[in-house]
Amino acid sequence: MDYKKSLNLPDTPFPMRGDLAKREPGWVAEWEETQVYQAIRAASRGRPRFVLHDGPPYANGDIHIGHAVNKILKDIIVKSRNMAGYDAHYVPGWDCHGMPIEIQIEKKYGKHLPVTEVQSKARAYALEQIDRQRKDFKRLGVLGDWHNPYLTMNFSNEADEIRVLGRILEKGYVFRGLKPVNWCFDCGSALAEAEVEYADRVDPAIDVAFPFTDRGALARAFGLDEVDAGAIVIWTTTPWTIPSNQALNVHPEIDYALVRVTPAPVHGPLLLLAQERVEPSLKAWGLEGEIIATAKGEALEGLRFRHPLAAAAQGYDRTSPIYLGDYVTLDTGTGVVHSAPAYGIEDFVSCKAHGLADSDILGPVMGDGKFVDSLPLFGGLSIWDANPRIVEALKLADSLMLVQKLSHSYMHCWRHKTPVIYRATSQWFAGMDVKPRDGGPSLRESALAGIDATAFYPAWGRARLHAMIANRPDWTLSRQRQWGVPMAFFVHKETGELHPRTVELLEQIAQRVEKGGIEAWQSLDPRELLGDEAELYEKNRDTLDVWFDSGSTHATVLGGKDGVLGGSHGAELAWPADLYLEGSDQHRGWFHSSLLTGCMLYGHPPYKGLLTHGFVVDGQGRKMSKSVGNVIAPQKVSDSLGAEILRLWVASTDYSGELSISDEILKRVVESYRRIRNTLRFLLANVADFDAVGQAVPYGELFEIDRYALAMTAQMQAEVQGHYERYDFHPAVSRLQTFCSEDLGAFYLDILKDRLYTTAAGSAARRSAQTALLDITQTLLKLMAPILSFTAEEAWKILAGSALAKQADAPRVTIFTEVYHALPPFADGEALTAKWTRLRAIRAEVQRKLEEVRSAGAIGSSLQAEVDLYANAADHDILASLGDDLRFVLIVSRATVHADADDLRIEIAASGHKKCERCWHWRPDVGQDADHPEICGRCVSNLFGAGEPRTRA
């Protein structure tokens, strides 16, 4: 007889190899065809709402690995929340306006298209990009409302954004003023804080002398009767700002010194600078000197000094006063700061505080980075080309003390990678320290309070965002672009004032935009709204900062706190969102702008929690770079290894820091995936012939080890669900992996094989095991589904068509409409766990001893061994309680327990009996049945009799 055929060998259509790259697109197509997302919505209707609001990626270019990380994390959260019993929608969004798309239109069609044509072509281009990105996001296994995303360029969104502008204007936050803003010459526009990045740059660092003018006043400040000629010395890394100098700054508490130097410079023998900087400065200038007097900075306030280029051109023959400034430091330079209010925030604030009118601020730099033609000596030059000319002019005017090359971190445009300057322009602002008209705290105060009320994942994000809000300037709302939501104001031609009915007019304009998009504002004749007044007003040509676009989506998409706007997806989503999730750069970007708009509109943040993930780097910790050649595209990984591997990599990595990826790292992820898949295959194969309705064993009648396995599974499930709840995905993956490899593979399933394969197919022993395995399989698949979505769905289809097929509440078409599995509570769960934890420890000791004996050549497999265990009372009771089933737990042919006063002692010997050809145990009763001499007594009973007596394992 071929006894192998008498075994219950496992079988399943779930293949060992996932063949993910080839098979995943089929699942994506099936989810689309069967409308899985809509099925999830129907199954979740009426449950508590959970809202993850999607931070919109920009609609330009293919997705990169950072996009994949972001979307996969969001998908894990939404799926896990749905399976935890929430109604969690996922409405993807796209950011559509702004410079990058405008640049693409200029590249393709030139720079001189009419504005309406730029807008229509930009709109079409954005739609093309969205289609490309949407396809790639869906390929990652991300489920969402892909047919109805929110787009910031949707007419309704553009209209509601204008309404948001009207509301914050009405509240008193918006004003127009001259201020230095981040300015990119290539963009020809102001930039948001989030659009500025820092890179190293080499600039000339110069020490410049401003000659004394009123020597009598200077002498009195230092307590002297008189002083010789000389100069105060400043240090700057922006020579191009010297023509615009209008003041000097010193620190009120710093000691300043008058130094007599030799050889004497042309402007005189005295130099004025901070006392602490005298020694290093004289050394750098190649001068000797002695301090003749000192004074605190506050004594110098109001003293005036001649412009250093006065001797070079009459247009610079003016003086600059000293203003006090707490921001002056002694880290570098001379302790004296030159102030050009048009090109520095602190300079601007200081000069304005001392009464300088906007009209008196010198701003010779045009939007393209060139000086106005009328500027003496340097008119028409770009500021960067002017730098060496200015240095040379200072030298000829005998005002240059020193020039050096300095490498330093400097502001750059994140799009063009070119230097950015501060430039005073007339812009529209949201005031950080403005009190709203209806009373209450300022925007800065309410935003800081909102940060304190927000949950941060990881926790360090709170301090980072807090510092940014505490120190940020007013928000520059306006941009000088064409493809953007208009700041649809009518401005008086003479006074510059807004029309008195602006809020009302904005609503009328919004209604037009709702029907025709932002193009409706472009084509609007002012007379249609203003009548005869139209001659007095002009249309404001500024557009809103794109960060206002995305930053107001909590109102335009979620519907806002009061529901007045409704929101494009207000019915599915809710305000505030439970979670915003983006990369760490969004503390400066979307988190930031959303916080400010939320606080301006409603006095609160639009989110309850912020989750931040790090950037992706290679295996050596380097940023992804085409020049370095270390870029890993998500499309390539999906096409070669499968998106499932990307998903597992994301979930396995601690996203709170940098996420490392490389071919080697992905190979390790593939190995982890294979181990999980093999576990699933074993589980599915061993419940393939099981009917959950007609063959399940009541939980109270399960074998002891099966009850323990379920208690162990319940504990694992609670831990993993807790990790999901806290957005801790890498510990969740780790726990699932150890459960599969250690709790199941190396323990429970290892022990179970004998019972599953050798007992009668319909025996209570085998059905008990299958009952437990089915619960374990369902639990495991549902816990894995948010991460390993393709694999869980594949396995679920098989399970639903076999073991679960006859259930009255048979599983739905997809695992994603399920909730986490409800495991039975066991009254003796804690006692079982304590007992079997000790049994596993003893088993590990036995296995170690068995390995020693096997290595010595005394036995082959562990089944050739017979074990004697000498145990103290506590261990003896535990071991003896299993009776003959102990040998199955230890996977040996005999296990005998002996009472002993001492700690555990294990003796192992090779069996002297014959090996059963069916179960491979070495037993004394092999050969005793004349009809079946090749097999042991229990196999004879299992095949031809009542079956072996077995209740524990």
UniProtKB/Swiss-Prot annotation:
Residues noted as binding ATP in the record, renumbered to the chain: K626
UniProt keyword terms in alphabetical order: Aminoacyl-tRNA synthetase, ATP-binding, Cytoplasm, Ligase, Metal-binding, Nucleotide-binding, Protein biosynthesis, Zinc
Motif ('KMSKS' region): 623-627
Pfam families, sorted: Anticodon_1, tRNA-synt_1, zf-FPG_IleRS
Binding sites annotated in the UniProt record for L-isoleucyl-5'-AMP: E582
Gene Ontology terms: cellular component: cytosol
UniProt EC number: 6.1.1.5
Role: Catalyzes the attachment of isoleucine to tRNA(Ile). As IleRS can inadvertently accommodate and process structurally similar amino acids such as valine, to avoid such errors it has two additional distinct tRNA(Ile)-dependent editing activities. One activity is designated as 'pretransfer' editing and involves the hydrolysis of activated Val-AMP. The other activity is designated 'posttransfer' editing and involves deacylation of mischarged Val-tRNA(Ile).
UniProt protein name: Isoleucine--tRNA ligase
Lineage, broadest ranks: Bacteria, Pseudomonadati, Pseudomonadota, Betaproteobacteria, Burkholderiales
Gene name, Swiss-Prot/TrEMBL: ileS
